[in-house]
Curated annotation (Swiss-Prot):
Protein purpose: DNA- and RNA-binding protein, involved in transcription repression and pre-mRNA splicing.
Protein name: Poly(U)-binding-splicing factor PUF60-B
Coiled coil region boundaries: none
Family: Belongs to the RRM half pint family.
InterPro entries: Nucleotide-bd_a/b_plait_sf, PUF60-like, PUF60_regulator, PUF60_RRM1, PUF60_RRM2, PUF60_RRM3, RBD_domain_sf, RRM_dom
GO molecular function, one term: DNA binding
Region described as Disordered: 356-398
Name of the gene this protein is made from: puf60b
Tagged with keyword RNA-binding: yes
A Pfam family this chain is assigned to: RRM_1
SMART domains, per the entry: RRM (SM00360), RRM_1 (SM00361)
């Protein structure tokens, strides 16, 4: 059985060729790795459920409120902080430079998800600044460190954090503190032809490596040009960053920096008594091995009558080899790398292998169920918050009208779901410049996450000398944050003007009707 011929001789099948035996071994290795990943996910879910049970018991014992809402709130805050950490503000951009130039300049630090450049509808030119969003926070951190004051198009560009980072600063600091417990570094601008082993062999010069993993596309299996390396000693990671940043490897200059987030940033720190990572991986490997041994007999017998088995006989390849070479599957992975760090903004509870593991070890449905329940609870909580949030300054009079008029009640319900604030009488046409939008976003970012800012000039007549009124629309990600901004900014004085901050109808805003 060890040489891959025992089963064939018993069933009257021809012996495997050396190439087929090699492919079969690769398939077995890959199946074992996927099984270990699946078991690790199950362990994570079980550990989280145990933490939740402990929180609930503590809440009942001590008379606290619902712990589930608190746990969800922490997860949502960490998710929002990670999203903010992935964005950088780029200012002082020369007006002739376009999005392609910005992308080319900032792409070496990591994959870019989006570039948001604000355009002037009159001049059809951008307003001199942009927001670049990366897939991982480490890419944004490197861009922030290495691109500020760099000459681009004859100007020294300004690179900084978005204005909305202020509110998330405590959580960002907490993530950074958790990241310091791991000796991880981030490596970007990796040549497409280099493999995990190539990178590991280069960086091993600075110390013993615990794990080296490049982020890969789930469909093609090709790496995305970045990855994470974890050393055993802190000094090794420091030496690697100082020596390998801007190192020419394969014709591309590497970008190397310290990791600013833990391996699984959406998880709160493990409580004392939890299983250490190494022990968890070892336990997962043992569990996967036992499960695989139990499934061997049933899998072999059932495969004899399957269509895949018939196809394998026609092609001269065993079924296991066909499975190993199916589209979207990565073969030839090393089983010695049993530490699986998830990179980017991926919920570790939902992180599943790129392909389905063997039938007896499929993707755990409990993870999907848990996510669905948590999502439903979060939506219910947000809906309740939205309906209870104050609506502008005339809340008392609005409540009176609600009791009298059903139509007014429906209107109030629609408005309570709006996340758009309009600022009136804040500036005049002569005060509009390239920095105004960024300044408004930074100021409003103190009250919550700002999706976008629109500066609208409304002419009050068809005459050439008709008065122009400037309205500034600010869209938040949450209605509660928008209401905080209204309460803080309404009737506030700015440059000799008394600002009026009001809620704006969401449907009008979505349909680009800014005239109300």
């Amino acid at each position: 059985m060890e040489n891959g011929q025992g089963t064939g001789s018993k069933l009257g099948l021809p012996p495997l060729t050396p190439e087929q035996q090699e492919a079969l071994q690769k398939a077995k290795k890959y199946a074992m790795e996927q099984s270990i990943k699946s078991v690790l996910v199950k362990q994570t879910i079980a550990h989280q459920q145990q933490q939740l049970t402990n929180l609930q018991m503590a809440a009942v014992t001590m008379g606290f409120g619902d712990p589930l809402s608190s746990l969800q709130s922490v997860a949502a805050q960490r998710q929002r902080a990670l999203a903010i950490m992935c964005r950088v503000y780029v200012g002082s951009i020369y007006y002739e430079l376009g999005e392609d130039t910005i992308r080319q300049a900032f792409a070496p630090f990591g994959p870019i998800k989006s570039i948001d450049m604000s355009w002037d509808s009159v001049t059809m030119k951008h307003k001199g600044f942009a927001f670049v969003e990366y897939e991982v926070p480490e890419a944004a951190q490197l861009a922030l460190e290495q691109m500020n004051s760099v000459m681009l198009g004859g100007r020294n560009i300004k690179v900084g954090r978005p204005g909305s980072i202020g509110q998330a600063q405590p959580i960002i600091e907490q993530l950074a503190e958790e990241a310091r417990a791991y000796n991880r570094i981030y490596v970007a601008s990796i040549h497409p032809d280099l493999s995990d082993d190539d990178i590991k062999s280069v960086f091993e010069a600075f110390g013993k490596i615990k794990s080296c993993m490049l982020a890969r596309e789930p469909t093609t299996g090709k790496h995305k040009g970045f990855g994470f390396i974890e050393y055993e000693k802190p000094q090794s990671s420091l030496d690697a960053v100082s020596s390998m940043n801007l190192f020419d490897l394969g014709g591309q200059y590497l970008r190397v920096g310290k990791a600013v987030t833990p391996p699984m940033p959406l998880l709160t720190p493990t409580t004392p008594g939890g299983l250490p990572p190494a022990a968890a991986v070892a336990a997962a490997a043992a569990t996967a091995k036992i499960t695989a041994q139990e499934a061997v007999a049933g899998t072999v017998l059932s495969s004899l009558a399957s269509p895949a088995h018939i196809l394998s006989q026609q092609m001269g390849l065993p079924q296991a080899v066909l499975a190993a070479q199916a589209p979207g599957i990565i073969t030839g992975l090393s089983t010695t790398k049993t530490v699986f760090h998830l990179v980017g903004l991926v919920n570790p509870v939902l992180a599943s292998p790129p392909v389905t593991a063997p039938a007896s070890m499929g993707t755990p449905t409990s993870a999907v169920q848990l996510h669905t329940e948590v999502k439903r609870e979060e939506d219910s909580r947000r809906t309740a918050e939205d309906h209870s949030a104050p609506v502008g300054n005339g809340q008392d009079s609005e409540l009176e009208r609600l009791s009298v008029s059903a139509s007014a009640g429906r209107q109030a319900a629609i408005q309570s779901k709006s996340t758009v604030m309009v600022l009136r009488n804040m500036v005049g046409p002569e005060d509009i410049d390239d920095d105004l939008e960024g300044e408004v976003m930074e100021e409003c970012g103190k009250y919550g996450a700002v999706n976008r800012v629109i500066i609208y000039q409304e002419r009050q007549g068809e005459e050439d000398d008709a008065e122009i009124i400037v309205k500034i629309f600010v869209e938040f990600s949450d209605a509660g944050e928008m209401n905080k901004a209204i309460q803080a900014l309404n009737n506030r004085w700015f440059a000799g003007r008394k600002v009026v901050a009001e809620l704006y109808d969401q449907d009008r805003f979505n349909s680009s009707d800014l005239t109300a």
